[in-house]
């Protein structure tokens, strides 16, 4: 009985298993049905795609999505396999392929689908009728205006035996291969069944892991007509991108233009290269040329910047009442993206550009007609944008078309070379009015570019404008929990409230940040002799060896400061620089110590040496056409910068002396807050800790990179923070006990009057000034969220950053080295008879034999290998290191002598008799007073400008109303009402206001 039950149970299991197997093998044609997770496609009728060209190859593909139909049967032998016929129901159905030429089909950003990442159509059935490959892009495009010629033939790089075989390595699914070589132990197979040979050969081993549903692109040899001897291609955009574009009425929307540039950027226009804005139906004038420079930033930083730029273009196109902008304002804007090095650019950034239609893989060449390609230029007018979340935004979100020029430099030659491509190549070709510079990672506000442009439109003397850079605080402002981010946020805010407005009033801003700034292209041009701002600006790229002294080399680390000075000091011109507070851009600041130190090393060295250069060459200002009051203001600004330079140079000693005198005051037993000489012990410990950390900073900075000594630098910052915290405590304690003594609350505690006054005035000129200016500009929140972190980390700014910067003056790199190696990974395009482009390879066996014979001769003759001489780069590095040693030694000795001399003359208990401490504290007061005057003046001028603009708009409205009234009433009666009875009181009042405004305009000489 038990045996019969086991047999029946086993038979039932076998039938159930057979039913499941037959259920899997049964094929059901796909019919789209609505489900909660995936609604029915809203496309309706699928557009008919033209049949493929003869050069395409029908390669079946499998979808790996869940729920896709599976193979209905598996052959037991490879040799007797035949393709099963397609069911009639499948042959008549329409579907969307799971891939497009081997690439996964992306989500559609059309408004009809809401930007959903899901495919809008159902996947293709596993076995389809002939013609299921109609989604392939036709390779042969017969057209008179197409630069591609006919006669192309497909190249099979892998030399597969059969592209139609389902056993091919590139098409077979891993699960099926495993099923063919495994035996299901749960199945009772009969002995007559034959197993598939597990050692069957499927072709060569793949070079990399293959992905399901992905087909590698097939290359073909084509004949291409050269234009002026250069390789210029018009390539169709991907079909899926073309399918949802709102506009397809012009070639700039349907084709991407590729140009292989084989010349130097200075010779771009002379060699006859032209951009789309110079030819055909796309010939246009360029008002704004936007430069976005990038190195190895990822796709998140790139999309933040690019999406912000496209939002600004949308805003410019929405200004329908503007004389310059409007619905077609995008035609006056060109976005130029320059990548510094093809091998350095982030692959996913290229993917993002490809998604926009700007970039296509596999069309670039290393060599054209035996000339090395220096830059690959891609041009396309995109109609979609990618936001930082990598979601498509199109016309449904207000995105306007954007003319994109993507320059992919073949070699990594640093940022200055990228700017040379921008100004000397593309700028000369397009002749824009305004050039805007952006860094990848900076997100401009939706109206930032308009406000920058408006500054030039309102004042013809403005040659450059700087926007307000804000530090990124992260989601929910959680980044402020990091003291490094909080301190930088405070620093950026106070610079935009105090420093930039002051410099804008003078007319010379020391630095227009490369992250968000603008220049008038005409003002940048050199004179007839080749001298001018751009000539001086690009000198830093060609300096080598001892010809580039260390001062000049470090000065060009802050290349944006060079342009600022050269513009203001341009001979026989009267250009000024302006700060535009309404042009806001947000950038990510370093949140780790190594990145922070490396960034500030370049900034500090560049700022220091550029300030020295501007002070030494201050006499150039008298050769300009600035008015006399303007020249006087610029000289005053030069004196202010000189004072700042002195404080920077002796910042190390001044910090130690301030700590020595203020913290040393608590060593007196009368005012010791702790008692039992604890104040004296704390002072001695912190004093020696300060000296020890300073000495260690020199050793670490001259021998270690921040990335390799992160803990050492972190330890130094912590010690400096403790010292600063104790110094602040001592300062507040001295002020409190003096106030108590003066009010009579506690007469036993009293400090000298001089020390009290000095401390109070210094506090008012720093903390008080910061609060006043922040509330004046209605932006005080950083005082409550970031000021504490800034004051605690202030010694690290003075000591750690300055020591590392001066100890690395020999390092004049941007963190990258020039790349001059010729890569041939893209192949070479060789011109034959002036028309045909072919790939270079040995033509006959004789060529291979000749190369082999030459190698044998060199081995037989033992040709002496010459010694490698000392390279120019090594000589340059040795020279810079020697100058670094001398400079650091002089700087360190000067600070030590000052600190030792003052500490010997005045003891820690000198109090009010310490003249040097009084000079330091009152100097802080004077510098702060200059900053607050400049900041207040800028705020007043800003209010006056807004009032004048409002008055102008109000008068224009009244004039329009008066014209309307006079036109609608009777002619003679209207004239009598207007002119009869004398002048009205309203006219007299308007004339008086006009006269007052004219007098005020003459008085504001600083705006000339």
UniProtKB/Swiss-Prot annotation:
Any one Gene Ontology BP term: chitin biosynthetic process
Gene: chsC
Protein name in UniProt: Chitin synthase C
InterPro entries assigned: Chitin_synth, Chitin_synth_fun, Chitin_synth_N, Nucleotide-diphossugar_trans
Function: Polymerizes chitin, a structural polymer of the cell wall and septum, by transferring the sugar moiety of UDP-GlcNAc to the non-reducing end of the growing chitin polymer. Involved in cell wall integrity and mycelial morphology. Plays an important role in septal growth or maintenance. Acts as a positive regulator of conidiation, cellular responses to oxidative stresses, and the production of malic acid. Negatively regulates the citric acid production.
Taxonomic source organism: Aspergillus niger (strain ATCC MYA-4892 / CBS 513.88 / FGSC A1513)
Classification via PANTHER family: CHITIN SYNTHASE, CHITIN SYNTHASE 2
Glycosylation sites: 312, 833, 961
Region annotated Disordered, chain positions: 1-160
Major localization class: membrane
Lineage: Eukaryota, Fungi, Dikarya, Ascomycota, Pezizomycotina
EC number: 2.4.1.16
Family stated for the protein in its record: Belongs to the chitin synthase family. Class II subfamily.
Catalytic activity from the UniProt record: [(1->4)-N-acetyl-beta-D-glucosaminyl](n) + UDP-N-acetyl-alpha-D-glucosamine = [(1->4)-N-acetyl-beta-D-glucosaminyl](n+1) + UDP + H(+)
């Amino acid at each position: 009985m038990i045996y019969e039950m086991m047999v029946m149970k086993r038979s039932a299991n076998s039938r159930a298993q057979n039913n499941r197997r037959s259920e899997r093998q049964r094929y059901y044609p796909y019919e789209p049905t609505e489900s909660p997770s995936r609604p029915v496609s809203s496309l309706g009728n699928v557009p008919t795609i033209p049949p493929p060209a003869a050069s395409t190859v029908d390669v079946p593909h499998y979808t790996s999505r869940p729920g896709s139909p599976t193979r209905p049967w598996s052959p037991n032998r490879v040799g007797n396999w035949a393709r099963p016929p397609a069911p009639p129901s499948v042959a008549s159905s329409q579907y969307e392929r799971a891939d497009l030429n081997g690439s996964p089909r992306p989500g559609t950003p059309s408004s009809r689908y809401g930007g959903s990442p899901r495919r809008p159509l159902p996947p293709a059935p596993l076995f389809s009728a002939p013609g299921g490959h109609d989604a392939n892009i036709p390779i042969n495009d017969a057209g008179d205006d197409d630069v591609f010629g006919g006669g192309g033939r497909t190249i099979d790089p892998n030399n597969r035996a059969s592209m139609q075989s389902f056993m091919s390595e590139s098409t077979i699914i891993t699960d099926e291969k495993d099923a063919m070589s495994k035996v299901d132990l749960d199945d009772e197979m009969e002995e007559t069944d034959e197993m598939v040979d597990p050692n069957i050969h499927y072709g060569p081993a793949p070079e990399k892991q293959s992905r399901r549903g992905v087909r590698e692109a097939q290359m073909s040899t084509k004949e291409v007509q050269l234009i002026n001897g250069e390789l210029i291609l018009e390539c169709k955009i991907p079909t899926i991108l073309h399918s949802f574009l709102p506009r397809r009425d012009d070639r700039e929307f349907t084709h991407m233009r590729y140009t292989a540039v084989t010349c130097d950027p200075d010779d771009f226009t002379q060699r006859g290269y032209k951009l789309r804005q110079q030819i055909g139906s796309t010939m246009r004038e360029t008002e704004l040329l936007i430069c976005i420079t990038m190195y190895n930033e990822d796709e998140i930083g790139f999309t933040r910047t690019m999406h912000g730029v496209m939002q600004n273009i949308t805003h410019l196109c929405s200004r329908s009442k503007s004389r310059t902008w409007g619905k077609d304002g995008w035609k006056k804007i060109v976005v130029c993206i320059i990548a510094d090095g093809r091998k350095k650019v982030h692959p996913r950034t290229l993917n993002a550009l490809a998604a926009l239609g700007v970039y296509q893989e596999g069309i670039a060449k290393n060599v054209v007609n035996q000339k090395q390609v220096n830059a690959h230029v891609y041009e396309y007018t995109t109609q979609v944008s990618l936001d930082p979340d990598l979601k498509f935004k199109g016309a449904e979100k207000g995105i306007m078309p954007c003319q994109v020029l993507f320059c992919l430099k073949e070699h990594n030659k640093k940022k200055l070379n990228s700017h040379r491509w921008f100004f000397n190549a593309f700028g000369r070709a397009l002749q824009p009015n305004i050039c805007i510079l952006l860094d990848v990672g900076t997100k401009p506000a939706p109206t930032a570019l308009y406000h920058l442009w408006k500054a030039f439109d309102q004042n013809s003397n403005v040659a450059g404008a700087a926007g307000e850079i804000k530090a990124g605080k992260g989601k929910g402002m959680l980044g402020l929990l990091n003291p490094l981010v909080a301190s930088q946020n405070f620093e950026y805010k106070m610079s935009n409230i105090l420093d930039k407005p002051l410099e804008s009033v003078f007319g010379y801003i020391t630095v227009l940040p490369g992250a968000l700034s603008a220049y008038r292209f005409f003002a940048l041009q050199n004179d007839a002799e080749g001298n001018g701002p751009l000539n001086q600006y690009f000198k830093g790229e060609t300096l080598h060896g001892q010809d580039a002294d260390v001062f000049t080399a470090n000065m060009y680390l802050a290349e944006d400061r060079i342009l600022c000075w050269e513009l203001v000091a341009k001979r026989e011109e009267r250009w000024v620089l302006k700060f535009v507070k309404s042009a806001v851009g947000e950038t990510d600041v370093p949140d780790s110590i190594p990145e922070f130190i490396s960034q500030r090393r370049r900034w500090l060295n560049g700022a220091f040496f550029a300030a020295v250069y501007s002070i030494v060459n201050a006499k150039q200002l008298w050769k300009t056409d600035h008015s006399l009051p303007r020249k006087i203001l610029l000289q005053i600004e030069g004196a202010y910068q000189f004072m700042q330079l002195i404080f920077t140079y002796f910042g190390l000693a001044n910090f130690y002396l301030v700590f020595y005198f203020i913290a040393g005051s608590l060593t007196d037993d009368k005012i010791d807050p702790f008692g039992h000489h604890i104040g004296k012990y704390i002072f001695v410990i912190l004093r020696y800790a300060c000296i020890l950390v300073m000495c260690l900073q020199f050793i670490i900075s001259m021998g270690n990179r921040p990335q390799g000594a992160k803990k050492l630098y972190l330890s130094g910052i912590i010690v400096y923070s403790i010292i600063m915290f104790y110094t602040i405590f001592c300062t507040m304690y001295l002020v409190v006990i003096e106030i108590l003594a003066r009010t009579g609350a506690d007469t036993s505690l009293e400090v000298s009057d001089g020390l009290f006054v000095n401390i109070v005035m210094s506090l008012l000129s720093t903390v008080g000034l910061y609060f006043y200016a922040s509330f004046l500009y209605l932006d005080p929140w950083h005082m409550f969220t970031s000021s504490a972190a800034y004051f605690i980390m202030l010694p690290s700014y003075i000591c750690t950053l300055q020591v590392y910067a001066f100890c690395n003056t020999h390092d004049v790199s941007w963190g990258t080295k020039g790349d001059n190696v010729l890569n041939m990974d893209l192949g070479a395009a060789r011109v034959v008879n002036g028309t045909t482009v072919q790939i270079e390879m040995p033509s006959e066996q004789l060529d291979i034999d000749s190369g082999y014979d030459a190698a044998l001769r060199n081995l037989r003759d033992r040709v002496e290998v010459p010694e490698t001489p000392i390279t120019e780069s090594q000589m340059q590095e040795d020279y810079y290191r020697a100058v670094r040693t001398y400079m650091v030694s002089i700087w360190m000795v000067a600070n030590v002598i000052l600190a030792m001399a003052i500490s010997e003359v005045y003891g820690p208990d000198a109090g009010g008799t310490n003249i040097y401490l009084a000079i330091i504290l009152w100097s802080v007061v004077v510098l702060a007073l200059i900053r607050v005057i400049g900041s207040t003046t800028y705020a007043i001028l800003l209010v006056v400008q807004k009032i004048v603009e409002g008055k102008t708009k109000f008068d224009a409205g009244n004039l329009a109303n008066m014209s309307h009234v006079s036109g609608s009433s009777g002619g003679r009666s209207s004239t009598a009402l207007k002119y009869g009875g004398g002048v009205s009181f309203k006219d007299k009042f308007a004339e008086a206001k006009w006269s007052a405004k004219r007098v005020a305009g003459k008085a504001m000489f600083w705006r000339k």
